[in-house]
Amino acid sequence: MSESSEKTGTTHFGFRQVAAKDKKTLVAEVFTSVSRRYDLMNDLMSLGIHRAWKRYFVATAQVKSGDRVLDLAGGTGDIAMLLKNRVGAEGSIVLGDINASMLSVGRDRLIDRGVVAHLDYVQCNAEALPFQDKCFDLVTMSFGLRNVTDKDTALCEMFRVLKVGGQARVLEFSTVTAEWFKPIYDFHSFQVLPRLGRLFARDAASYRYLAESIRKHPPQEELQAMMGAAGFERCRYRNLTGGIVAIHSGYKY
């Protein structure tokens, strides 16, 4: 079930209940604020492990040379950079992000690293993708779905633009599975992380929201069911690092 309420027109922004129409603006303010320090944010949130998670996410994707890939919530280009090696010179990647600041950081970073060929940048909303039906072999979203207002619609859009036989993959912070670890994780998320955000980025509020958004994100089984409801088949998930993150995948047949 999507986090938006059709009856009240409200949704969650972290632990706050806000008008659904306002969430995009509030999320945009967060990511505009953290865009120049996005990698630092991920390091603080994951204790630096996010790079290994992303490498595994791409390494286990169904993608081959010549494929056309859509990377949603492409951020600073980490996933696109890894995918470029998989699709090769014959393939292409579209890096999409709703936030112009994030997209700019990603473009500059990839250009600085010499990654320019067969790579397009599109500012787009995952709930209303500006692409034709059945035009991508793989659709990925890394650490972005929890910030989407209507997750069900976004998953349906991912399904729509995917070719028959293609795969969608979502890498996202999830629900920790080890009971003994939950108090430690909560302490890091709600006590340590905002203080680090204030110290290194002068922005405790954005980091507090990001921690809260993880707790409001659907747990593994629920998100798997949501992907099935969007039309995907063979929906699976794999927990990494005790469920701190999970990789969800589904196919279009």
From Swiss-Prot:
MF terms in GO: 2-methoxy-6-polyprenyl-1,4-benzoquinol methyltransferase activity; demethylmenaquinone methyltransferase activity
EC number: 2.1.1.163, 2.1.1.201
Swiss-Prot/TrEMBL keywords: Menaquinone biosynthesis, Methyltransferase, S-adenosyl-L-methionine, Transferase, Ubiquinone biosynthesis
Protein residues bound to S-adenosyl-L-methionine: T76, D97, N125, A126, S142
GO biological process, one term: methylation
Gene3D superfamilies xrefs: Vaccinia Virus protein VP39
InterPro entries, A to Z: SAM-dependent_MTases_sf (IPR029063), UbiE/COQ5_MeTrFase (IPR004033), UbiE/COQ5_MeTrFase_CS (IPR023576)
Bilayer-spanning residue ranges: none
Domain of life, per lineage: Bacteria
Pathway: Quinol/quinone metabolism; menaquinone biosynthesis; menaquinol from 1,4-dihydroxy-2-naphthoate: step 2/2; Cofactor biosynthesis; ubiquinone biosynthesis
Pfam families: Ubie_methyltran
Catalytic activity: a 2-demethylmenaquinol + S-adenosyl-L-methionine = a menaquinol + S-adenosyl-L-homocysteine + H(+); a 2-methoxy-6-(all-trans-polyprenyl)benzene-1,4-diol + S-adenosyl-L-methionine = a 5-methoxy-2-methyl-3-(all-trans-polyprenyl)benzene-1,4-diol + S-adenosyl-L-homocysteine + H(+)
Function per UniProt: Methyltransferase required for the conversion of demethylmenaquinol (DMKH2) to menaquinol (MKH2) and the conversion of 2-polyprenyl-6-methoxy-1,4-benzoquinol (DDMQH2) to 2-polyprenyl-3-methyl-6-methoxy-1,4-benzoquinol (DMQH2).
NCBIfam families documented for this protein: MenG_MenH_UbiE, PRK00216.1-3, PRK00216.1-5
Family: Belongs to the class I-like SAM-binding methyltransferase superfamily. MenG/UbiE family.
Protein's name in the database: Ubiquinone/menaquinone biosynthesis C-methyltransferase UbiE
